[in-house]
Swiss-Prot record:
Known role: Atypical mitochondrial nucleoside-triphosphatase (NTPase) involved in mitochondrial trafficking. Probably involved in control of anterograde transport of mitochondria and their subcellular distribution. Promotes mitochondrial fission during high calcium conditions. Can hydrolyze GTP, ATP and UTP.
The keyword Magnesium is assigned to this record: yes
Name of the protein described by the UniProt record: Mitochondrial Rho GTPase 1
Modifications the protein undergoes after translation, according to the UniProt entry: Ubiquitinated by PRKN during mitophagy, leading to its degradation and enhancement of mitophagy. Deubiquitinated by USP30. Acetylation on Lys-105 decreases sensitivity of mitochondrial transport to elevated Ca(2+) levels, increases mitochondrial transport and promotes axon growth. Deacetylated by HDAC6 which blocks mitochondrial transport and mediates axon growth inhibition.
N6-acetyllysine, modified sites: K105
Amino acid sequence: MPAGRGRPLRAADMKKDVRILLVGEPRVGKTSLIMSLVSEEFPEEVPPRAEEITIPADVTPERVPTHIVDYSEAEQSDEQLHQEISQANVICIVYAVNNKHSIDKVTSRWIPLINERTDKDSRLPLILVGNKSDLVEYSSMETILPIMNQYTEIETCVECSAKNLKNISELFYYAQKAVLHPTGPLYCPEEKEMKPACIKALTRIFKISDQDNDGTLNDAELNFFQRICFNTPLAPQALEDVKNVVRKHISDGVADGGLTLKGFLFLHTLFIQRGRHETTWTVLRRFGYDDDLDLTPEYLFPLLKIPPDCTTELNHHAYLFLQSTFDKHDLDRDCALSPDELKDLFKVFPYIPWGPDVNNTVCTNEKGWITYQGFLSQWTLTTYLDVQRCLEYLGYLGYSILTEQESQASAITVTRDKKIDLQKKQTQRNVFRCNVIGMKNCGKSGVLQALLGRNLTRQKKIRDDHKSYYAINTVYVYGQEKYLLLHDISESEFLTEAEILCDVVCLVYDVSNPKSFEYCARIFKQHFMDSRIPCLIVAAKSDLHEVKQEYSISPTDFCRKHKMPPPQAFTCNTADAPSKDIFVKLTTMAMYPHVTQADLKSSTFWLRASFGATVFAVLGFAMYKALLKQR
């Protein structure tokens, strides 16, 4: 990880231009410095003030347009000076090395004046410029060093000569660098250590880069890090040299041949102390950080256009990334994430994104830990319901960096308009939303939990404050793995447009409650009778004594009248996991909404779908066991 200029930074990574203001006492040579830079020779005649100079991006080392502004006390008012200070990104305070009065004015006038015009928490970076070094045999550094130690906003001090062009280009490079690669957010000179925000950002970067999660960066991980940040690999000897530097200074910076977090942080401290903080900034910006060490909105929320009637899903590359993320943190290889393993995974997040309800939204093991399938299901749910949140989460995990993609938007597939699916009588979607509707206590939550393979005994153990209104799991239809997302819709007289929007409707009534079916019938007539959304009626709690429903016709006759499949008997009160038949039917109806009601009532149609589900569930389990053996 050598200190170098590294990869070209993207436009969003740092400021689009730099504005440098030169101030100082009269006749210290401010204008001469600017004119010497532009003409590359000392001007014989110097005007009272130089016009604003713009240096194009292609001739500056950092490829950023730079504006250089001169200040003349003779030509400008105090108000104009204050305005220039407010517009500047960096200020060069120029003094003459042979003029003690101009040096004294640095602290008695200029620094206080500038600081009065800037916020205490975001001071402008300052460069002290000692001009006319050609006129003396000595250096002013002894006098200037205490000033630099007193004011942390001073980035550096440069002695130069406009007459013989000494350090002129270096002066403006340092000024530009002070804006693009500021020391302030990274390092505290008084404490001689990195600031907490910088340590936090670099720790996240280390954890993302530690792809096998063993607490060190091995040679392969260091080389990958070097390549994505600086566009160049490290030779084996260079890698060893880096580790030797760390070994020389701290005892626990290298372990098992890899760089530890302490070693990683030490290297960056060393870069900053040696004035090579552009190296640390290159790394920070590559991983999405701005000048305040916050992740940028451009990094977390890349542009993703989603037309109406389209949904969002994870693509194959995203699932591979999430599989590797799961494997990285499943340290005991039990195909489930314990609370500690999940906490470790979320250390790269600024907050814990999942609450206890997630454990009742997706599949868990007997300990209540999210399984491999449950982990992928939760990401699928987030992508479908709130794709911006999914992009944010993938950003925290470093998706675009580890997969070397432009952004995490490349992880998302935007499905085509549902109307096209209906016209073509086929769908490319893999996630289907089913709204589960019924009276309170009719058994809707039982249906949701049954999708996760939980019987009534297991459901009774769920705390009220941990309940979820969503459940998602995979279902096999005709040998294809699809995700079925169930949403429990609260009972109300009229449904909102958002509550109607789905691929299939599951209308649930309680066979033991005579008033239960009437609500399903009313909601169907109000919202779904004339729509193209397929509906399935589920007769829940079928293990209880069935009573006659207080409605004009029976549920069976109602289904026949409206050309729907007959009511599906369902119960969670089973010794093993509840039957998955209704979920296969719901997913099939969502996949094939154009299929005629006659086909839906055909036992052969359902047999083909269910047989495919059984075969692929068995195959899936076999592949799962094979995966375990490989791991």
